[in-house]
Amino acid sequence: MMIPMKIRTPRARHVRHIAPLCLRPCVLAVLTLVSAQAAQAQSLAEPVLLALNARMPSLQDTVVTATRTEQPLADLVADVSIVDRETIESSGATGLADVLARLPGIEISRNGGVGNASSVFLRGAESRFTAVYIDGVRVDSQSTGGAQWEQIPLSQIDRIEVLRGPAAAVYGSDAIGGVIQLFTRRGEGPARPYVGVGIGSQGTRKIEAGVSGAAGQDGAFDYSLGIAREISDGFDAKVSGSHNPDRDGYQSTSGNARLGFRINARHRLDATLLASRMNAGYDNTSYSVSRPVDDRSLNRLRTAGLSWAAQWSDVYSTRVSVTDSVNRYETTPSPYLTETKLRGYLWQNDFRWGAHRFSAALERREDDLQNSPIDSSRSQDALALGYGLNTGRHTVQLNVRHDSDSEFGGKDTGSASYGYAFASHWRATASVGTAFRAPTLYHRFSEYGVATLQPESSRNAELGLRYAQDRSSFSVVAYRNRVSNLISFVGAGTCASAFGCYANTARAQYEGVTFAGSYHLAGVQLHGSIDLQNPRDLDTGKQLARRAKRHATLGADTRIADWTLGAEVQASGRRFDNAANTNVLGGYALFNLYASTRIARDYTLL
């Protein structure tokens, strides 16, 4: 049983709070106190709207991730999903990966409970093939490759944008499967403090607090501060080999600060900071009953960014940013420590001339890995150009980019997308693109590494059909993404290790069809997505590990009397736990129920 209580002064927009009642040993009820000022703006009879777990974005929403420039969703050809804070709260998720798993085209795998290593597969692609940003700050590990999802504190995230499909022509290395951007809260209006407290099964305790708002003349200075603490005794996670009969609990602490200053109508400064610490238990496969130990993983993440945005004229704007992130992973008592530092510099230029949009960017990325005995670094310098057109029924987006790596030289990528509105509310889309990922410093310079490894490269093509009107929408996207020079762990012989080495030996293909939709029928809002995919190794014909050929999410909510009720089911087919396809992981289904009612002017029961 988990009973959190939140005291919150919400934003002036329509307030939505939900928490799911999951069919597992954890039932969640929330009593939320909202400010009298916000309550006066809404009558008692007004329904509290549920933010669905996979909200279909409105065409009026603006998106940054597709082109690195803020654009209305209606102007984009890209396949994008948006998750807002209300949706995050409604999900009842304990981690970011659980929220993402509800979105079209995404499935996850996890090695144990909260705090243990997780993988996020975007359209079936390797977890390292997704570029991840927090407030524009790149998050990556030069040891394992890709973001360490368990390090990212969900309590500090206000909005998520997911771009499906290769985007290396915009973002450079890593964006073979897509891009996920995370945004922290941004202050506006009067000061709005909030406090949340929760207790639950498995000895779980949570507390969070923060404040956001704006001050100064016309709110020129805005701020948002937040902190959260979570502790759980966990459960006994079982692994192969000897079983350690302990509970693998976790402790996490996180905080964030976001400050903004509008110098005048044309210039603005922003600064962001996020930090998190996670201490989680796990079971080592080499556990011995005669010498029991409590194995722990210690995760630390810090991101910081400073940016200046300038609107020089009605048609020309620039943005300059400096970003920094530190990703640290350690295990005890088994001695292992790896730390990745990333530094980024970006000068973005945008021109708008009628229906035409032009962009030009210079970018530098510096990577550093400390993983004894490795002490290595590298840099990438890039020039990116983009062109967009939105006129009448036609939408065009073109991007090219050249990356110069200090280790392996230059790499060119490009993408072209076209959308045609052939009827009212309908649009057909087509796109092609290339992408790459540079091998990590660990892949090249560890005892298992090979210095001559080449970047993994991909070619993608996709077709889409979309419909959107009022509260109903539908989309279907068919894609095929082929990767060459795939880096895999093979037998010994080309490196110093006798256990095996990394090598460019494999080819992979990620192909499939994603259906997604939302429909309002007789007072019931339906939503869902179905993915049919075939992620496979082209050399062996085997299905790629830990990815199912079918997975889906279906849900509905409605209002009955004074209650808003909802239900959701997530289902996934069988997968394999190894590349040889000999260890089968069975399919599963997860059911969620949630409900909401206002019991007094200032109280909502969830």
Give the label of every model feature segment.
Residues 97, 101-137, 158:
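Extracytoplasmic beta-strand/coil segments of soluble accessory domains associated
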Residues 260-278, 295-421, 472-478, 520, ...:
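Face-selective signature of the C-terminal outer-membrane beta-barrel domain
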Residues 387-395, 480-482, 502-579:
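Gram-negative outer-membrane beta-barrel transporters
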Residues 168-169, 181, 188-190, 196-198, ...:
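Periplasmic-side early beta-strands and strand-to-turn transitions of outer-membrane beta-barrels
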Residues 137-164:
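Short acidic/polar hinge/loop motifs at secondary-structure boundaries
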Residues 1-103, 261, 519:
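N-terminal Sec signal peptide and the immediately downstream disordered periplasmic leader
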Residues 288-311, 341, 406-409, 421, ...:
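Outer-membrane beta-barrel signature, preferentially recognizing the C-terminal barrel domain
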Residues 6, 10, 26-27, 212-216, ...:
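Conserved C-terminal beta-signal and adjacent last beta-strands/turns
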